[in-house]
């Protein structure tokens, strides 16, 4: 069972132990969803994910 509420609420504010299985949530944190890859400086400040790779489309 996914400990995140992403699928239900569209938000995800959990810690490093959380693992979202679908990155359709609109407020994923880097530690929570794989759409913000580890080591991605563009995603390091808790920005909203909109992509799955560490490039200009990674976050908005």
UniProtKB/Swiss-Prot annotation:
Residues that bind a divalent metal cation 6: 36, 40, 43, 59
Binding-site list for a divalent metal cation 3: 14, 18, 23, 28
Highest rank taxon of the organism: Eukaryota
List of residues binding a divalent metal cation 2: 6, 12, 14, 25
Transmembrane region(s): none
Matching PROSITE patterns: METALLOTHIONEIN_VRT
InterPro entries found in the cross-reference section: Metalthion_dom_sf (IPR017854), Metalthion_dom_sf_vert (IPR023587), Metalthion_vert (IPR000006), Metalthion_vert_metal_BS (IPR018064)
Coiled-coil regions listed: none
Annotated GO MF terms: metal ion binding
Alpha as annotated region, ranges: 29-60
List of residues binding a divalent metal cation 4: 32-33, 43, 47
Name recorded for this polypeptide: Metallothionein
Organism (species): Lithognathus mormyrus
Highest classification ranks of the organism: Eukaryota, Metazoa, Chordata, Craniata, Vertebrata
Name of the gene: mt
